[in-house]
Amino acid sequence: MADWDEIKRLAADFQKAQLSTGLQRLSERNCIEIVRLLIEKGLIDVIYTNDGKEYLTQDHLKQEVKDELYVRGGRVNLIELARVLNVDFGKIEYTAKRLVEKDPNLHLLLGQLIETSYLQRLASEINQKLVQYGEIHIGQLTTTYDLPTDFILNKIVLANLHKVIFAKQDPTNAHIFFTQSYIARNKAKIRGALAAITKPTPISVILNLTDVPARILYMSLNEMSSLGSVTVQSPAGQYIPHVYQRMQAQWVKDYFKQNGHIMYETVTKLGVSDVRSFVQAQLPDEKLVQLKNCIIGNRLIDQVKDSMDMCVTSNSYLDISTILPSSLSDDNIEEILTHILTPTIRKQTYVFGMVVLTVNFMDECVKGCLELVNEHAKRAVESGSYQKYIAEKSIKHQEVDHGVMEEEKADKREERRKKASTGKGGGGAQGRETKTKSTKKHARGTRGNVSDSDDGGEIQTNASNKKGGKDPHIELITAKEIAKVVEKTLEPEGLEMLAKDVANHYFPILSKQALVKAHELYEQSLQKNNQNRRQTHASIQEKLNTLYNDIRLYEKGLKLFPADVQGQLLKYLLKTFGTDACNELCLYVASECNLNTNFNAPLTTEQRTKIANDSGPEYRPHLQTLCKALSASETVEDFLDKTEKTMQACSMMLKKIDKKKDRNLILCHKHGLLEQLTNCTDPALVLHLAVLIIFTISTQTMLHASGRHVSAILTFLQTVLSTDDSKVFNNYHDLVLKLLSTESSTTEEAKANAEDITKQLGELTPVVKNIAGNFKKAGVTPVE
């Protein structure tokens, strides 16, 4: 204590010296030196300011801190305090800690020095906020006052609860405080809102309308459970009032009682999630049938059953849509039919959409199709399309049988190879490993089936699959044709829209009947054809013999000409009579082989070639050779030889040559030419017939030639005609050529020349006819 008194005395002396006159004051440097010495000796304890120009004692610093705390309202930041007092922050912090340790009313928190009076003032402000808003959250206070949450909760709110702060802590959230009046006010809002709601309402909507906190709403809903219930206690949940549930139940009962059914969609719109359970709960005494999207009562089911029984009994039809509510869809009606159609009823009825037709009623509708079936079957046989179908099916069967045989052979070869490779005792391979091919068979496919029209059976083979072709098929009657007949029967009943469905149903049945009928007609036609074929065979044989003899006789006439003319006459003879013979044989073979013979007569070269190539193996080589001979033969004998062989292949006999009959044939040929000449007026044809008549009489042979060969024939006849006759014929021939040349011209001069030539020909024609008609071979007596 004496030291401190001494220090005080020295300080007083120091101050006195400072305030004395200049001669008695110490300099600033001396003062600093004195203070330094005092500090070194430990006689004083002072604190420097930040700029080093001032000194403070600890007590004075404490007092300065308290003064600043008071001035700032009981809360001061240590950093701000160090700046204001111009003292190092560490000294300020140290001083603040000492003050807090000695004074329980002070708090050091987050670098701030806080006095209890400040906390009391905050408590009063918080209470005012509660009075104003009714609710407050510690988190909001933390943001407002920049203080830790726990400090505000424990040191301010809880410490002053029921003293300065009059509120109630939320039991579900310790950081929320509210007043009792606030709770009562919100509950009144909620009660009024819930009482006004008559349909399911989202919790979020109630929260938005009432502006009530969600926790208070959920707390109130639990207390007001008599008004309604909540699906989920979250904004995504819904509040369902009990009055709405009662309305739902009553609506479902009334609707079902009136209509006998109820749609799921309708009940779902009422806000019911589990429709089936809800409806079953509301109608416990009803026998309900659960369908895909509706529930049907037993009353409607019984009504449909009674109508169905009446329909079957009367052999008529029933439109289900006329006895069921219009609100039911086609799928609903189909489900009802599935429910009521017993196996017995199914055998007697067919269902097309919403219409049920009895079997007897449908049979009456398609009676008119039986005549159509017979007509189409007859047409198919007459046109040959059914025969083509039979032939294709036969070929297909042969391919199948061949494929099966090849497969069996392959299986046997594989089996023998397998036995050889795994044979007894160690022999042929000298104990070495022998490689063998895999004997695994590939799976047979299901395509390429062959069907039999008689029994409808199917054969599946691997061979048909390899061919890759479809089964032979013929359609004798179409569903469209059946529909036209059925529509006439259904139209009076107003059911014409079912014609297509009924036709599609009966199409396979009537198609099979048509095939059976076609097969019967085909068998009958085969029997008739066998009889006609024998007659046809004899007729064609006679015709071919006639053509053969004519060609043979004409050959004698053309051989009298020079070689160059012979070639032309031979070509013309084969082109006419030879072609006729070849055509007859081709048509006969086509008929025998069931080939398509719908060709325009006469046959063309391509048609003859096609028939020859498509014919059977017993006919093909001979017919192909004959067709080639028409253009390739150099002599008549060659063509006749091939014709004879082809006739033998067709089982036709060639009659022996009778020379007596040859003379009669030549005579008949001459009389035929004379008759034509008598009735002919065309100059070119008159000349043609006249030279043929003279040639036949003079050579006693027949000649087949065209108009272009007249000149060559006239040259040949120069030796048998008199000079005058030859001159007449040459002149007549020249006039004919001139007339033919002028006919192609349209000039007036050409027309005048044509008239003049025609006039001259008219004068010479009787002369030419007279010469030909009266011509006699020298030394020969005419035969009548």
UniProtKB/Swiss-Prot annotation:
Q: Which Pfam families match?
A: E3_UFM1_ligase (PF09743), UFL1 (PF23659), UFL1_C (PF25041)
Q: Name one GO biological process term.
A: response to endoplasmic reticulum stress
Q: Which GO cellular component terms are attached? A: endoplasmic reticulum membrane
Keywords, in A-Z order: Transferase, Ubl conjugation pathway
Top-rank taxon of the source lineage equals Eukaryota
Write the Enzyme Commission number(s) for this entry. Answer: 2.3.2.-
A GO molecular function held by the record:
UFM1 ligase activity
Q: Where do the record's region annotations for Disordered lie?
A: 398-472
Function comment = E3 UFM1-protein ligase that mediates ufmylation of target proteins.
UniProt family annotation: Belongs to the UFL1 family.
By its UniProt entry, which PANTHER family does this protein fall under?
E3 UFM1-PROTEIN LIGASE 1
Name used for this protein in its record: E3 UFM1-protein ligase 1 homolog
